[in-house]
Amino acid sequence: MLVLHFNLYEAQILPHERLATSVFLEHGPLQVTSFNPTTTTGYVVYVNSPNASFLEPVLSKLFQSVSPKLPFFKFSEQTLSFSYGPHLQGSQTTFSKDLVDVVKNLSMFTPQGPENAFTVERIEYYRTIHIICDLKDPKKRHIRHLQKMLCNPYTGLTNFVIPQDKRLEMDVLDAESAVSAPLSDPLWTMSNGLFNLLGYSSQYSVFKRGAAPKVFVEKNSRLAISMNIDYWNPWSSTNMLYDGLHAIEKGLIYSFGSFTPTPSLTSVFNMAQHWYVPMFSACQIGHVMQLPLQTHELSLTGSLPMKMLQAHLNLLKCSSMPHIQGFFRLVPKDLSHILPQTKIYNGFISTSLCLQTINMANEHPLQDKTYLYQLGNFFTYHKQFLTCQESGKEIGSILTALAFFLDSVKTYPGTIVGMSTSLPVASMKAKLAAVCQQVCGARLLVSALPPQVVAKLAPFSPSNRVENKKMLKQYFFNLLTSDLIIAIKNVNIDAQAALKTACYMAGCRFKKIGLLTHLKGTEVVDNTVERPYPILRFDRFKPKFPLLSSPTSITFLEERINWQDLNLRDTILKILEHPSVGCKEFIVNHTDKLISGRVARTSIVGPWQLPVSDYSILVPMHPCTTEEVRENPWDYETDIDSHCVFEEAAVAGICSAIGESTILTQADLKVGTIRAITEAILNLSMVPWNNIGNIVIQLSITLPYTAHVSTYLQLVMETAKTFCEALRVSCTFTANATEGGASIVASAIVNTLDVSKCITPDLKFNNSFLFLLTTEKDYSLFGSVAQQILEKTFIGEIPSATSPVMLKKMLSVLQTLIKDESVVSGHDVSDGGLVATVAEMALSGGKGVRVYVPHGEDAIKFLCSETPGVVIEVQGSKMYYVQQFLHSENINFQIIGESTSSLTFSISQNLTKLVHEPLELFKSAWRSFSDACEPCQIHPRPYRMQIATVPKYCPVGPCRFHTVIVYLLPNNSVPHGLLNAIEEAGFQPRLVSIHQPSKTTNVYDPHTVWGFFIVGASNVQDEDVGMRALIAQLKSHVAFQRDLRTMLAKPDVFSVAIGALACELLFYNKAIGYNKPSDTYMTCVKNSSRKFESRWSNIYIPESTKAIAFQSLKNSLIPCWTQGTHLKFYHPKPMLEKMEESGMVSSMFYGHSLSSGPAQNYPLTPNGENAIAGVCSADGRHLALLHDPSLCNNLWQWPYVPLENPPLKVSPWKTMFLDLHKWGITVQGASPPPSRTSDPLRSFVF
């Protein structure tokens, strides 16, 4: 194998590198230099070709587009250089997997034809730190220090040995191997009822065959909620997939969750309803962890648990699934021996069509050939190395391919015969068994096996039989992989062609690996030799389970806490500072919360944009007209305003919430189970629903695998079943075995008819009253945050279990109060107790509060008790009515305070003030942990809007002759929000996948196409390299570039690019920002934070802008969602000034009001420096935006709607899409056609 080496590319020093080298600076303990260290990057490329000379200049150009090369960089004798990166003889990193997948789609890499597409096998990058040692000579201890700080075992990085020659002949890399079969998860197997299936050996487990009923779903429970859902599929040149049109069908919404010890999303394949393929999924996440004792910035963010958190968030971002909710649980120090391991929770809220598309495999259908396909690459993933995890990009592409394929075969049930889901272990042999369902077998072809596996095999002969079987087990069957196996047969259609098309459009690797057979077990056939083909046979899958571990003893201390000795003010501040209670902006602001356009409620609410929401909302179907009308006004009218409306239609949604019980569960499984379910349901209590029976609870359980695990699991499920039956709600289960203590997460979903009626936690008015409603009268301090901060977590009495009767009654009362508009805000009582609940309501609403401790109550116990309940805000005019109503219903309640206009937090008892402090003090405490994770930022203030027009929209449906193309960039999910915004404006959207560079079919039709949108982002783990590689891929897409150039040249066609990757494509084609004298292009560069940003930004539309989409919005200041890693436009300063002077700046990041001016500080401008948020061409036809109006095209997508007079009833961003259609009406077919506007930037000399 040939190795190409590229080095000395400029790089910015990273925080952990700055920390590691700080000791080398002057006056440091290991001082050697008075200069700041510098860093460079390099790349090592493995090429499986004897002659790859054409690759060197192409790869060099690609890497230089990411960062400039330093050609004259020379090392002096006093320079200490230390390189670190992945071990070249070890596991392939996720970065390499993703980048190689992109590179293989570059036509420039395959000049000799498609057969050379697999020339590049691996691309790894490393970093080098250069230190000029002018004070002292470097010693070995300096190298050892850098190695200790930068080569942490959990990252998989090591002291990098740089090849001395650019071209080295090396042996073929050794494939990963697993000598013995991986152990299966016994709890997962039991909760799925898999012990009743043939082939599952009970001799390795404490569970006995037949003794464990299938309790995955209780017989009286339902799995899902049925609602209408809408979806889009891309246009395809085959007749198997539709023309990218909008479809509405009856669908199912369901939830599913599980725990893992490391960052992983593969459980998304193991849906609770795995026979329904998900059309769309959103993710809930949770982390249970310990943190190091030091809490300063670099030691905190560089710790293993926080690195795992960041890896998990990056994995989620790359999968194109929005993150809608989560929890963060810090393990108390006195329980560190019980919960030593990090636990990561993944929950999925998914939509599916109501079609049984997967039939169980059985022997009868095998009369027709049923083929096995592998979706995704055969890559092993390593739980111990964060750099070698599974690929989020690949997981997302598999899910997208399945959704596209489902739409093409939905009318042909039985097409999918089996799928590798619901697995006790993700080994290849287990996946094949799951597809076969233990009633048939699989025949695999040697020609379809991975090359690294085939390289290990000897010719199939009796003498080699034992060795070959050993190799196949060790290098194939026993390995944990992140791919998906699917069995398909043709049912009156060419299903295989449909799968191929769907995978191409989704950017998902696939190949045929074999077929199903009548013979049980697995056969491997060597079809590379002449017939008769030799065969190796393997027994069917028989999972083995780990040995039982010893239970960890839990000690309950008999000592008491003297609460009267504690200082109330200090105790409250410590509770708010606790990471389990405090602000989660360090997570929420750096995850993709909105990518699909279906998210109606994230965790961010209120004018202060704080993450305190109890629930999230997804909209399965956008409220737009899809039925074709006989006479569409867009066909014959030039003035469409008479058909416009000034209020958005109500939209139904699915509300989801989670409840978590880890600390309390260690002491009492039954109480912990009920507490998790109670919290999840109370988090939904502010959602108006019609019937409590519509709620579906999904309980995710993780227990240590000890001697009594079977009893414990049955206890948890029986407790949940009894409690849910009493509430009349449905309940489903999943279970996992993990090290350490138990954890239980309840995910609840319910449908609501109008998402705008849902109540948020932020206080709305001054002088309103706060009511506390509780499910029980006793204090709940055992295991509370108040006791955790004292390191006396398990002291006192374990709280009693919540009464389902009382909980149900309280929920019914709250629903009545919400529907008669007596409640204006509400928040559940959980971690941190009542004081944390009231503080979050005050902080998110920007209101002061006065809290009254009832006479005779202990103030600290009253305020810190975590008794399940809800605090509601009631205006003064409704106070007596609510009070009387609660009395009449025998609800436990107290009036515990009121809101005030003064920004103070006051606590009093019997007219004595116990605490009276500025609200800012409590906000600082609540934000302290988040600020420690990302310091040096200015927190946003409430935004003020200014709208230059009355927002309206025209709901008459799309005109089928006014087409707008929406290009779906590689490995991105379908932009439902954008498609519906375009359709709502009267256009007919046409979704086009451009993943295939070899595709030559043109999609532009000059008679019907009025414009095009490009939207998407890089889903490669390293954003810089990934984005440049994807741009190179799209530049080489012949048909796409041909259509793009044609449409850009048409004076009556508009274009809109949303996101950095899309903007780069317009810049590359010289549509915006090109300067001919200097031959410079505009470009997008990475945020100053070096992170993914998701911000609710204030956007100003300049009066001078020429953008046709913003003509009605000139001089408007409107908030909008902004997401991405590259949110900064770059051009030489004179060019940016010239663009602004010429009206080519279309939008700007602004402060909280017009008087604040353009934003200059992070995060008001998410990039940290530049205020420009959008640019346009000189004639205004072409628009490049870093913010995304399609994600806030409806008011229900806004985290907070500012109070206006009159109230805002239509999103102003609808005007943008309406203006585009109005412009098209005026220019399409105009005679003479629109004249070209000269671009002052083209000839500008600076």
Swiss-Prot record:
GO MF annotation: an example: phosphoribosylformylglycinamidine synthase activity
Pfam families assigned to the protein according to its UniProt record, in alphabetical order: AIRS_C, GATase_5, Tegument_dsDNA
Task: Name the UniProt key words of this record, in alphabetical order.
Answer: Virion, Virion tegument
Which Gene Ontology BP terms does the record give? intracellular transport of virus; purine nucleotide biosynthetic process
Q: What is the protein's major site of localization?
A: virion
Which GO cellular component does the record give, naming just one?
viral tegument
Q: Does the keyword Protease apply?
A: no
> What is the superkingdom listed in this entry's lineage?
Viruses
Tell me the compartments it is located in. Answer: Virion tegument
Q: Does the keyword Nucleus apply?
A: no
Q: Which NCBIfam families match?
A: tegu_FGAM_synt
Q: What's the name of the protein?
A: Probable membrane antigen 3
Name of the gene this protein is made from: 3
